[in-house]
């Protein structure tokens, strides 16, 4: 179903001319729900749930379903749907063999809480390759890219077909500003402005963002669509509850009422850089915007496993600019602004007078020098409301959650070092939970074997529990072989870069074999144990661990004190860490 927009609209038409509407009409809803209750059902992921909501309301117009093979292949290769329409990101529904889908049949789609969302007629089932998609769409096979690591765990088959949406995913927070594209357009219409400048954000807004957006709407003589993402963003981002409180405070106090519309977007970001920026432009057009502010490294995931950025700083701006005639959305560049303290104003870097005194605070400094140390951000950098909200929601680093992940071969010394470190952290005032790989297998992962699939499941279970501990401000130490790089990166992505410390216990195989307290290596050499890491199954060492330990040169206590000193240097523990009797702290 597609709905007409109002003929007299002053706003740009939706992408493709009309907004898709997949909602079952109210008159048919009871019958459709009764029918759905008789169908087999599958639970879809949080990402697919976000995508379904965006499809249902027309945010992905002209797309009206999870992509079939023809659309998927062409989008992957050419950034276009099968009919030639520009569309840069694949929107797919991965399924597994266990879902037991049959072509031509109907299936009910449910979310993670088992709430009934939609009926899908299975019209296509087709194979896809996560590595190929990572390379062609996101320019990477590196599991340090969060979507690449995530896709490796998706099913190898995609399903597609007609969707009849019975209800949108339930939201109980900020319901007054959760608006569909049609609802957003209606509010924008009331402002009387034909030009709409959209600002995509997944971070708190500071004075520089306020200044930038005000300049943009003045330049375009338009209204600002402040459109923060509240679906899935980059792991480790400030939670959306905190961010939205900031946005609401700024919108209410520092913008003219008819010059801003704050609306939340339930988008699951891919952190896909230039392709994602183009996708954002299409989504914002469907919400009524004809301009999009695009910053440096827009939707970038950070650095790869070799410490290099996945995308160039201006790739996203160039992509949106290149296709502006097709999307109908102009690119407004996010110019870098500096504060001039002597004049109490912001100015573009290129226009700062020679010799003028300037001030700036980087994102890293915000986290480490201010929030991480319990200091309020200065008024020239953030509005008082923003500074107070962030201070309330973002405790000093020594009170933040933390995961210390020990990885290495069996017998490397992970558990021994972790046991010493636990006492040092307790001494420093940290409350610590230890998740040891051997112990976990007798409880949380009881019944799992040692196939690659089972090993991944074991590590992901440990990671999930650890992420919940971290989310609630606790400290957790995990000691597990965790041989596969992609799986470790997936666990890192559950917590974010700042709260995950990967410790590589770099003990050579021959040393581990000499220790062999459990006799496991001897059994593996005799062929009595299959798929044993280091013997018949590979161990993939970390490429850029936060800490690397040498257990041949240093004792477990020395290595534990090295880790504790590293944590103290970065503010994770407050009290000074005593050095060992020989004065050793660092390798």
Q: Where in this protein do the model-derived segments appear?
A:
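Active-site cores that bind ATP or allylic diphosphates and position pyrophosphate for catalysis
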Residues: 2-398
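Glycine-rich phosphate-binding loop of ATP-dependent small-molecule kinases
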Residues: 68, 74, 80, 191, ...
